[in-house]
Curated annotation (Swiss-Prot):
Matches recorded under SUPFAM superfamilies: HydA/Nqo6-like
Pfam families per the UniProt record, alphabetical: Oxidored_q6
Name of the gene this protein is made from: nuoB
InterPro entries: NADH_UbQ_OxRdtase-like_20kDa, NADH_UQ_OxRdtase_20Kd_su
Reactions catalysed: a quinone + NADH + 5 H(+)(in) = a quinol + NAD(+) + 4 H(+)(out)
EC number: 7.1.1.-
Protein name as it appears in the record: NADH-quinone oxidoreductase subunit B
Classification via PANTHER family: NADH DEHYDROGENASE, NADH DEHYDROGENASE [UBIQUINONE] IRON-SULFUR PROTEIN 7, MITOCHONDRIAL
Taxonomic source organism: Bacillus mycoides (strain KBAB4) (Bacillus weihenstephanensis)
Subunit structure: NDH-1 is composed of 14 different subunits. Subunits NuoB, C, D, E, F, and G constitute the peripheral sector of the complex.
Localization per record: Cell membrane
Signal peptide: none
Cofactor note: Binds 1 [4Fe-4S] cluster.
Membrane topology: Peripheral membrane protein
UniProt record similarity statement: Belongs to the complex I 20 kDa subunit family.
Lineage: Bacteria, Bacillati, Bacillota, Bacilli, Bacillales
Length: 172
């Protein structure tokens, strides 16, 4: 349908200009993906308690379009919170591999980002980024639910930026 703006009444033209947005398909997909993130919770330690708090009524992650999923096949974001041991590392990788593309990873807390206070243990992985590519790091021991919401918003910005520019800003 072609609209000739010269033939329209000035009020109609102004209304159309306010309500019609021009974009690329990639930007539209990026906007849709960023506003409908479905994180898979992978709580391994005390940070998981803070992650559960995000789903409570006080913070209500649902209002941002994110719904916690329990299956990796229904998720596009993996939130790793807590200490990742060498025994747990293959399971984390398997769950990541089961997620459909596009997929993102958030490392929540000191243990997931760099090993935390257990970094010198022989059984602890020195950061989940040694197993799967991480897109957003959330520091803290443990980080509060507001920090997780901030991290999810940063991931949304990253998704939109990648869709807008065509540049991938990941370490994949």
């Amino acid at each position: 349908m072609v609209i000739n703006f010269e033939e329209l009444h000035p009020q109609e033209r102004a209304e159309l200009e306010r309500n019609i947005f021009f974009s690329t398909l990639e930007q539209l997909k990026g906007w849709a993906r960023s506003n409908s993130l479905w994180p898979m919770t992978f709580g391994l330690a005390c940070c998981a308690i803070e992650m559960m708090g995000v789903g409570s009524s006080h913070y209500d992650l649902d209002r941002f379009g994110s719904f916690f999923r329990t299956s990796p096949r229904q998720s596009d974001v993996m939130i790793v919170s807590g200490t990742v041991t060498k025994k747990m590392a293959p399971i984390v990788r398997r769950l990541y591999d089961q997620m459909p593309e596009p997929k993102w990873v958030i490392a929540m807390g000191s243990c997931a980002t760099a090993g935390g206070p257990y970094v010198n243990s022989y059984a602890v992985v020195k950061g989940v980024d040694q197993i799967v590519p991480v897109d957003v790091y959330i520091p803290g021991c443990p980080p509060n639910p507001a920090a997780l919401i901030y991290g999810i918003n940063k991931l949304k910005e990253k998704i939109r930026y990648e869709a807008r520019t065509g540049k991938q800003v990941t370490n994949k």
